[in-house]
Regions:
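Metalloprotease/metallohydrolase-associated module, dominated by Zn2+-dependent proteases
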Residues: 107-142, 157-202
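Generic, low-specificity signal for short hydrophobic/alpha-helical stretches with a mild N-terminal bias
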Residues: 5, 102, 133-134, 149, ...
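Propeptide-to-catalytic entry region of secreted or membrane-anchored zinc metalloproteases
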Residues: 1-104
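Sparse, context-dependent recognition of short Cys/His-centered cofactor- or disulfide-binding micro-motifs
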Residues: 16, 77, 105, 131, ...
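Catalytic glutamate of the conserved HExxH
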Residues: 146-154
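Activation segment
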Residues: 101, 155-156
């Protein structure tokens, strides 16, 4: 089970280590982290002031497989680009921009299982967005939950009806905060059947 966390440096770098450590604990697998580069804002819609998450995931797949005819190194920092030579494992990008997809006004994150790529944005996960007092622990908790949720999709898991499960689909921040940082027994069994994760969890 190979998972790479691409942490765009426009998102506070100090959060990348605790997020990767908590993701690793939730998934019970090591997370490889790169956090010193900037990923292009693919699919930016000036009217909405958001990025199309589907286009971003497609670009991410092109980037990680290094297809020079489609993704030029000059699109981003060359040293950052060179650190991702032929990565074929599953990838989670953390980007600073607000995201949408064609059928939704916004998304906290999105996964593209066929490509093995996923993206999460902390844009609407911070307390400040809702006029609340800043709290890094809240933000870390939400990024981890949403990140683990999208990684679950990359391994073929569907949405779960258990409101406490990682795979429950949150409609808003309240739903996300209500979730726990674990997979329910059913989802855990499904995940373990697709990966090397142990089935015993709860």
């Amino acid at each position: 089970m190979g998972i790479h966390l691409f942490w765009d440096s426009r998102v506070p770098i100090g959060l990348s280590k605790p997020v990767s450590e908590e993701l690793s604990a939730v998934l019970e697998t090591p997370i490889s982290r790169i956090d010193n580069g900037i990923f292009p804002l693919e699919g930016f819609d000036a009217v909405r002031n958001q990025c199309d998450a589907v286009k971003m995931l497609t670009k991410l797949d092109i980037f990680r497989t290094r297809r020079p005819d489609l993704f030029k190194p000059e699109d981003m920092d060359a040293q950052f680009f060179d650190r991702f030579s032929h990565i074929h494992e599953k990838v989670l990008l953390v980007t600073p921009v607000d995201l949408f997809e064609p059928l939704a006004d916004f998304v906290f994150g999105l996964a593209y299982p066929k490509l093995g790529t996923a993206v999460v944005s902390p844009y609407r996960l911070s307390n400040e967005y809702y006029g609340r007092h800043p709290d890094d622990s809240d933000l870390i908790d939400r990024i981890v939950k949403e990140g683990a949720h999208e990684i679950g999709h990359l391994y073929g898991l569907k949405h779960c009806s258990n409101e406490s499960c990682i795979m429950y689909c949150p409609r808003n921040l309240y739903d996300l905060d209500r979730k726990k940082k674990y997979f329910c027994g059913k989802c855990r069994l499904q995940l373990s059947s697709r990966t090397e994760l142990p089935s015993a969890y709860e």
